[in-house]
């Protein structure tokens, strides 16, 4: 397929702008480009067809089953889009006088209040723009707390070996040293290893609950107690809140600070690079260090300061608020229960088909299969199975993560999938398992029906080409 630049022809454009009806405001010459930008020149019909073709090649939750583990690819109600498109929200400017945007301030305050209730936290800020940004903000709160108390030696953040990769990255960015905590044979935090790792240098522990293999940390009260007795704080990574929202609260488990992913748990479209939203909640004793909120205004003298310009990715907040108001308190819990039910249903179907779960028994909202045995028996890898799913119109699950499981495939079906969809997916995967044993070569070559097959991902990562180079230089 040609790139948009390759379809460009000199003089063929869509410059049908009306005459200027306001005073011209030219860019000062010292800031102006020396050469005109080399934008593609293309007619409107060709432009439309180009992007329609690209759209047909894309795959989203409205196109089919999308069980991408740890990403919560649930259906996003169109009500949120309608609310986010209201002129009173889209036509504002962050520098407007406060008295002209009272409705927007109220919407943010209502969202903060709702998120505080769901998480069991006392304060919430909407400033962080995404999940990892929320992690970074929460870690800065922990750092500021210890510095304020004169505990400058607390420089270590404990991170389980099953954690999301952003956890150690965020801790390092915040200036901490990362210490790894191994999982036990059941896929849970090893309590003895945690006790041994805690000490006078412990600033805190980052933990997801349910964890990244889809299991609830049944010793969570003991875990938070161990860290607190060592003088550290406990951070809740809200990546998996969809499994427990409305049912259990991180604040009641002993967590001191948390972030949420509005673009996952609260039904805002995601997966295309943004925008996201990663609000941070905390207990009262950390509130003096917060960057500010719609409910409580700007931060005080001990605040870590603003972590982004203005208030939030505002329209993501509006979508999340619409989702919460549409569900109401009771149905928020129903959504979480539906996510857990669907995950266990699909897990059982796949086990009956012959797949091996990394951890037997009930799971929460997601589960991990290990294809290590299948690869030894047939040579068919997790990558082969994932690629074969594309031929049947199913987006692959997360591959080779978490790292503690060999040949891992992580499924998260979410609450918005019907049983018939799960049955169909199970049937597809059962057929792939049959082919792995009868005709493994067909899987090594999969996918067979997609425009893009198996790109060289290693070369793409090491030598990325992210801009167009004109043939003439």
Predicted regions and their residues:
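Mobile "lid/hinge" segments at catalytic clefts and subdomain interfaces of large enzymes
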Residues: 275-347
């Amino acid at each position: 397929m040609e790139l948009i630049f390759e379809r460009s022809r000199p003089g063929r454009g869509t410059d049908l702008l009306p005459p200027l009806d306001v005073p011209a405001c030219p860019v000062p010459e010292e800031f102006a480009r020396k050469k005109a930008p080399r934008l593609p020149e293309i007619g409107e019909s060709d432009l439309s067809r180009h992007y329609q073709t690209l759209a047909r090649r894309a795959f989203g939750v409205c196109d089919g089953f999308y069980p991408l583990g740890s990403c919560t690819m649930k259906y996003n109600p169109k009500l949120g889009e309608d609310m986010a498109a209201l002129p009173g929200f889209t036509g504002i400017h962050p520098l407007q006088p406060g008295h002209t945007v009272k409705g927007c301030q109220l919407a943010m305050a209502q969202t903060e209040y709702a998120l505080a209730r769901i998480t069991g936290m006392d304060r919430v800020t909407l400033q962080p723009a995404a999940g990892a940004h929320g992690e970074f903000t929460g870690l800065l709160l922990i750092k500021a707390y210890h510095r304020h108390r004169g505990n400058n030696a607390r420089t270590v953040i404990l991170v389980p070996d099953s954690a999301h990769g952003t956890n150690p990255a965020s801790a390092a960015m915040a200036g901490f040293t990362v210490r790894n905590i191994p999982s036990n044979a059941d896929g849970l935090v090893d309590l003895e290893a945690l006790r041994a790792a805690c000490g006078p240098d412990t600033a805190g522990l980052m933990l997801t609950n349910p964890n990244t293999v889809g299991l609830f940390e049944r010793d969570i009260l003991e875990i938070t107690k161990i860290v607190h007795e060592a003088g550290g704080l406990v951070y809740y990574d809200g990546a998996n809140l969809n499994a427990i929202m409305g049912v259990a609260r991180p604040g009641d488990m002993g967590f001191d600070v948390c972030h949420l992913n509005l673009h996952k748990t609260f039904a805002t479209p995601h997966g295309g690079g943004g925008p996201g939203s990663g609000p941070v909640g905390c207990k009262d004793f950390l509130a003096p260090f917060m960057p500010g909120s719609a409910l409580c205004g700007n931060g005080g003298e001990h605040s870590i300061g603003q972590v982004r310009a203005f208030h939030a990715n505002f329209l993501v907040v509006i979508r999340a608020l619409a989702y919460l108001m549409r569900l109401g308190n009771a149905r928020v819990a129903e959504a979480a229960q539906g996510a857990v039910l669907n995950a266990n249903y699909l897990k059982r179907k796949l086990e009956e088909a012959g797949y091996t779960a990394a951890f037997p028994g009930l799971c929460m909202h997601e589960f991990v299969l290990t294809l290590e045995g299948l690869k030894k028996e047939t040579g068919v890898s997790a990558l082969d199975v994932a690629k074969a799913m594309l031929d049947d119109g199913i987006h692959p699950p997360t591959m080779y993560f978490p790292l503690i499981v060999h040949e891992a495939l992580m499924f998260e079906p979410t609450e918005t999938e019907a049983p018939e969809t799960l049955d169909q997916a199970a049937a597809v995967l059962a057929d792939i398992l049959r082919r792995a044993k009868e005709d493994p070569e067909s899987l090594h070559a999969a996918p067979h029906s997609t425009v893009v097959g198996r790109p060289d991902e290693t070369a793409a990562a090491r030598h990325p080409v992210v801009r167009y180079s004109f043939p003439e230089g």
